[in-house]
Amino acid sequence: MAGILVLNGPNLNLLGVREPGIYGSDTLSDIESRLQAQARVAGMPIDFFQSNAEHALIERIHQAFRDAVDMIIINPGALTHTSVALRDALLATAVPFIEVHISNVHAREPFRRHSYLSDIARGVICGLGPMGYELALQAALQMTHRSL
């Protein structure tokens, strides 16, 4: 499947109930529905995958390469700050990606300020809430020449 893959890491399945003061009240399903509608307007296939397991995210990145996915939008959650393996999978497959964070990681605990992915990403969006996903999709559509 050519198109865009949206990957979400650990605990993002809890959006809507997890620390709403930080992450808001939108569920992951709410976010995916908006992205699906936006991609449909642009005629761009889009797929979604969430896992709490690092290895499952890595396998999905490998599959994205085999499927010739045009772009990945990834919110790696806490794996942002810990996963060399996730970084290596993105480097090995060379699928371009945009890193997204709902909260402003730079305004939080010091350990959240380092990302193993930011320096190899096409772009990084953080601190704009769930709207960050929509902005990432707009950017991905422009980068793949399928703007809304």
UniProtKB/Swiss-Prot annotation:
Its EC number is 4.2.1.10. The record marks R18 as: Transition state stabilizer. One of its GO terms (molecular function) is 3-dehydroquinate dehydratase activity. Keywords: Amino-acid biosynthesis, Aromatic amino acid biosynthesis, Lyase. One of its GO terms (biological process) is aromatic amino acid family biosynthetic process. It catalyses: 3-dehydroquinate = 3-dehydroshikimate + H2O. Substrate binds at N75, H81, D88, I102, S103, R112. It comes from the Bacteria. The active site is at Y23 (proton acceptor), H101 (proton donor). Catalyzes a trans-dehydration via an enolate intermediate. PANTHER family: CATABOLIC 3-DEHYDROQUINASE. Homododecamer. Belongs to the type-II 3-dehydroquinase family. This is 3-dehydroquinate dehydratase. It comes from Methylococcus capsulatus (strain ATCC 33009 / NCIMB 11132 / Bath).
